[in-house]
From Swiss-Prot:
Provenance organism: Cricetulus griseus
Composition bias, Polar residues: 27-37
Name of the protein in question: Sterol O-acyltransferase 1
Organism lineage string: Eukaryota, Metazoa, Chordata, Craniata, Vertebrata
InterPro entries reported in the protein's UniProt record: MBOAT_fam (IPR004299), Oat_ACAT_DAG_ARE (IPR014371), Sterol_acyltranf_meta (IPR030687)
Protein task: Catalyzes the formation of fatty acid-cholesterol esters, which are less soluble in membranes than cholesterol. Plays a role in lipoprotein assembly and dietary cholesterol absorption. Preferentially utilizes oleoyl-CoA ((9Z)-octadecenoyl-CoA) as a substrate: shows a higher activity towards an acyl-CoA substrate with a double bond at the delta-9 position (9Z) than towards saturated acyl-CoA or an unsaturated acyl-CoA with a double bond at the delta-7 (7Z) or delta-11 (11Z) positions.
Length: 546
């Protein structure tokens, strides 16, 4: 194949020299017509001909260079593998090969040092933004934000006769911040102290007790009580009892979920080390220091390690830019709600609930839903996590991969949020495979999907004050089906288009259904609601009063 391309390339390059007599005749005719002078018209035509030939040769040249580059990289990997087998120093290729072999091994519960490997690397968007063509897309979003601001100011000036610079929606959404702050401090201090104290007490007493199983089960029970009873219940009770607004609730609930996952990772990664030390009858107990655990609680990862790759310095200018972009995205979402969402759902209440209204609502919600998808990704997975990584000199910045190039949903789930995916993969999927054996791979995958769907729906139900399992149905049923149907074997560009189209439609459905239900509960309140009223959709039966 490469030989044919080389021959075709040589043929095209030598095409002009195949018939020198014919070329000479043409030149003589041209010279005769112009009386020995080359006219400007002929010069322009010749330049166009050369440009066309260059464009025709361009893809062939790139293919040939790509083939040579692939051969070079393949030879480099083979040489590196042969050096590793000869006993040379450990290289990146040997590490990857070892990871591959470990993944195929029978014992799927790898010890911490053979789990996720952290290396110093930049976030993908930081690298892409160095390319002018990609950075232009970033500039386009900034330009769109400016237009949203101007549109809001102009409309308010026309309607009110003055410039209205009020942010009532933001003030309402982030209300009762003092309650949020003391709740967060209570969660943080309990997560810092209780899991560490329980683990340290268990680790020092495990090798001394005469009943290690009972000793371990008792400490595991107390840890479970903390995870579910204290950290799992108290924050939920606070947001409901104090009737916090939606954004404030999201802060508390997402931090609650994050700390539960962090505490689980800390215990899960360190328990095997203590068991191995007791098995080898080591005199030292491998208990991490408080500083190591404290660093992990703030580090932008859910996988515990005693140490991580660190950058040499902190770029405070970079940190400031990331936080400014987070606030910019926050105002971006505000203007999307003001200009695209609020008018849409205010008009919906003028018609009774029907299939026609629902379909129109879904398709009108696609644009704001997609914009919020991009903004959520950029604000949290890129800006927020990179800001904390820079302040902590955390070296591994791979919080996401190129999910926008996904041609399958399985690849999208792996690359959209690498931070959460790593936790689900190592502590849910691999542990389930270790516990139930490799034969139940599909059941383990189903369990991971169910866990993720339940946690997502729990967060939305608590934060919005009603249970409306639209996300659960989309994620658990359609997402699970697409994971098997549109799998990794699909590589053609058409499948990337299908993934994008389904993502657009799905976010339109989510925004439409949840917003309709929110407005219905605002305009059709119940005097004495029962538990069933919190789980029964009110948008289906609400009769708006004008």
């Amino acid at each position: 194949m490469v030989g044919e391309e080389k021959m075709s390339l040589r043929n095209r390059l030598s095409k002009s020299g195949e018939n020198p007599e014919q070329d000479e005749a043409q030149r003589s005719v041209s010279d005769t017509q112009s009386n020995g002078r080359i006219t400007m018209k002929q010069l322009i035509a010749k330049k166009r001909q050369l440009a066309a030939e260059a464009e025709e040769l361009k893809p062939l040249f790139l293919k040939e260079v790509g083939c040579h580059f692939d051969d070079f990289v393949t030879n480099l990997i083979e040489k590196s593998a042969s050096l590793d087998n000869g006993g040379c120093a450990l290289t990146t290729f040997s590490i990857l090969e070892e990871m591959k072999n470990n993944h195929r091994a029978k014992d799927l519960r790898a010890p911490p040092e053979k789990g996720k490997i952290f290396i110093s690397r930049r976030s993908l968007l930081d690298e892409l933004f160095e390319v002018d063509h990609i950075r232009t897309i970033y500039h386009m979003f900034i330009g769109l934000l400016i237009l949203f601001i101007l549109s809001t100011l102009v409309v308010d000036y026309i309607d009110e006769g003055r410039l209205v610079l009020e942010f009532n929606l933001l003030g309402y959404a982030f209300g009762k911040l003092p309650t949020v702050i003391w709740t967060w401090w209570a969660m943080f201090l309990s997560t810092l102290s209780i899991p560490y104290f329980l683990f340290q007490r268990w680790a020092h007493g495990y090798s001394k007790t005469s009943h290690p199983l009972i000793y371990s089960l008792s400490h595991g029970f107390f840890f479970l009580v903390f995870q579910l009873g204290i950290l799992g219940f108290v924050p939920t009770y606070v947001v409901l009892a104090y009737t916090l607004p939606p954004a404030s609730r999201f802060i508390v609930i997402l931090e609650q979920i994050r700390m539960v996952m962090k505490a689980h990772s800390f215990v899960r990664e360190n328990v095997p080390r203590v068991l191995n030390a007791a098995k080898e009858k080591s005199s030292t107990v491998p208990v991490p220091t408080v500083n190591q655990y404290l660093y992990f609680l703030f580090a932008p990862t859910l996988i515990y390690r005693d140490s991580y790759p660190r950058t040499p310095t902190v770029r405070w200018g970079y940190v400031a830019v990331q936080f400014l972009q987070v606030f910019g995205c926050l105002f971006y979402v505000y203007y999307i709600f003001e200009r695209l969402c609020a008018p849409l759902f205010r008009n919906i209440k003028q018609e009774p609930f029907s299939a026609r209204v629902l379909v129109l609502c879904v398709f009108n919600s696609i644009l704001p839903g997609v914009l919020m998808l991009f903004l959520t990704f950029f604000a949290f997975l890129h800006c927020w996590l990179n800001a904390f990584a820079e302040m902590l000199r955390f070296g591994d910045r791979m919080f996401y991969k190129d999910w926008w190039n996904s041609t399958s949903y399985s690849n999208y789930y792996r690359t959209w949020n690498v931070v959460v995916h790593d936790w689900l993969y190592y502590y849910a999927y691999k542990d389930l495979l270790w516990f139930f054996s490799k034969r139940f791979k599909s059941a383990a995958m189903l369990a991971v999907f169910a866990l993720s769907a339940v946690v997502h729906e729990y967060a939305l139900a608590v934060c919005l004050s009603y249970f409306y399992p639209v996300l659960f149905v989309l994620f658990m049923f359609f997402g699970m089906a697409f994971n098997f149907i549109v799998n990794d074997s699909r590589k053609r560009p058409i499948w990337n288009i299908m993934v994008w189209a389904s993502l657009f439609l799905g976010h339109g459905v989510i925004l439409c259904f949840y917003s309709q239900e929110w407005y219905a509960r605002q305009h059709c309140p119940l005097k004495n609601p029962t538990f069933l009223d919190y789980v029964r959709p009110r948008s289906w039966t609400c009769q708006y009063v004008f």
